[in-house]
């Protein structure tokens, strides 16, 4: 079957391939291990602007955090859970230290904090729009911190 520019599934697949390819290349150029596992039929109903905002903001942050690590990596996974009506978008990456302060809130370690934080606010706004969750977690074993994001319910995506 040929690509159909009027088919939302074809558009979603193309958007996915373009964005993931862009970040895979950035990671390769920066010696960051990059893994992506995006299951079929998981993102076609997410509008392109929302998909792009979620992935670009999260992957930009993941690259930033991973650059200072001895063994930098990013794992990107998208799958369906709960009988296929809930999407799980998970981005996990290495990080030198937890981005969460003692108060449990994100704190910027960037020198220029003027525009810092808008990306994650955008991700949260999109998750809220679809009755999803935007969850930041940290953890790890063997002294390797791990940061990640998970969220988004597909139940209210436009058909």
How should these model regions be labeled?
Residues 8, 12, 33-54:
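Conserved short strand/loop->alpha-helix "switch" segment adjacent to the catalytic nucleotide/phosphoryl-transfer site
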Residues 10-30:
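Short beta-to-alpha transition helix within the HATPase_c
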Residues 48-72:
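Conserved ATP-binding N-box helix of the HATPase_c
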Residues 73-85:
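Short beta-strand/loop element within the Bergerat-fold HATPase_c
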Residues 87-117:
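Glycine-rich/acidic phosphate-handling loop/turn and adjacent ATP-lid/helix
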Residues 97, 139-147, 153-154:
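Glycine-rich nucleotide-binding loop
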Residues 132-133:
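Conserved glycine-rich
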């Amino acid at each position: 079957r040929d690509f159909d520019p009027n088919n939302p599934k074809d558009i979603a697949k193309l958007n996915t391939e373009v964005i993931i390819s862009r970040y895979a290349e950035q990671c390769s150029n920066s010696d960051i291990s990059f893994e992506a596992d995006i299951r079929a039929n998981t993102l076609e109903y997410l509008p392109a602007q929302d998909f792009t905002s979620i992935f670009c903001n999260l992957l930009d942050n993941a690259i930033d955090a991973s650059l200072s690590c001895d063994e930098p990596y990013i794992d990107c996974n998208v799958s369906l859970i709960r009988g296929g009506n809930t999407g799980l978008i998970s981005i996990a990456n290495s990080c030198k230290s937890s981005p969460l302060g003692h108060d449990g809130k994100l704190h910027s370690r960037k020198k220029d904090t003027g525009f810092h934080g808008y990306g994650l606010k955008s991700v949260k706004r999109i998750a809220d729009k679809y009755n999803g969750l935007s969850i930041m977690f940290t953890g790890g074993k063997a002294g390797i911190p791990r940061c990640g994001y998970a969220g988004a319910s597909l139940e209210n995506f436009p058909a």
